[in-house]
Amino acid sequence: MNPWQRFARQRLARSRWNRDPAALDPADTPAFEQAWQRQCHMEQTIVARVPEGDIPAALLENIAASLAIWLDEGDFAPPERAAIVRHHARLELAFADIARQAPQPDLSTVQAWYLRHQTQFMRPEQRLTRHLLLTVDNDREAVHQRILGLYRQINASRDAFAPLAQRHSHCPSALEEGRLGWISRGLLYPQLETALFSLAENALSLPIASELGWHLLWCEAIRPAAPMEPQQALESARDYLWQQSQQRHQRQWLEQMISRQPGLCG
């Protein structure tokens, strides 16, 4: 049995039965073997679409990172790990090739779908934001007193934010005078997001504590939620329908492949 097959057996058993293949309950073994044979055959058929050859280094790195936890749990030598990563990279390339064969949605389909779902195409509320961070090593209270001093200076004059952020902030945004740009929900730590989206325009937050340290946020401007421009919305609708078409085409291809070739793996 080659490395990717051993890896697939191990991953299947651990993900579905929470144990190694050799430790499966005898009552579960038939179901495991049936699932394994099906998966093995599918993977063999899929990778056959992609000839052995050069695989982009970036793809190999991404695959290695995504499989790292599973690979670390197995007893695989470095050459075996490399073979497993290459196998999964070929799977990715094959699925991408299958997806490219899916029919693209025509303009009338996109327009009709967009008209039925216009309420989904909203630009979210955003805040033009600046950020100042003082990280904490040991004396949290001393850092708290420092950021209170910075808060008082900025609260007296917003013009003080840029030079103080450049001089004192431990956030990479210090290089841009604290600028984070337009921020939507879901991009910041929860406590920072809550504080930012409760601020009025041009308001400064009180110091906010997080696991990183103490923060100040300045909401320079507010851009309310609004409908997307029609052209942008149509492009988003097309992208969504195209993605759905690709996924549907991949599923149909797999179903046809399984029904035609019920082969086994050794």
Curated annotation (Swiss-Prot):
Source superkingdom: Bacteria
Any GO BP: nitrogen fixation
Keyword Lipoprotein on entry: no
Entries under InterPro entries matching the protein: Nitrogen_fix_NifM, PPIase_dom_sf, PPIase_PpiC, PPIase_PpiC_CS, PrsA_foldase
Residue stretches making up the PpiC domain: 124-221
Keyword field: Isomerase, Nitrogen fixation, Rotamase
Catalyzed reactions per annotation: [protein]-peptidylproline (omega=180) = [protein]-peptidylproline (omega=0)
Enzyme Commission number(s) from the entry: 5.2.1.8
Key word Ribonucleoprotein present: no
Coiled-coil portions: none
A molecular function GO annotation: peptidyl-prolyl cis-trans isomerase activity
Family: Belongs to the PpiC/parvulin rotamase family.
Task of the protein: Required for the activation and stabilization of the iron-component (NifH) of nitrogenase. Probable PPIase.
Protein name, entry field: Putative peptidyl-prolyl cis-trans isomerase NifM
Species lineage: Bacteria, Pseudomonadati, Pseudomonadota, Gammaproteobacteria, Enterobacterales
Gene name linked to the record: nifM
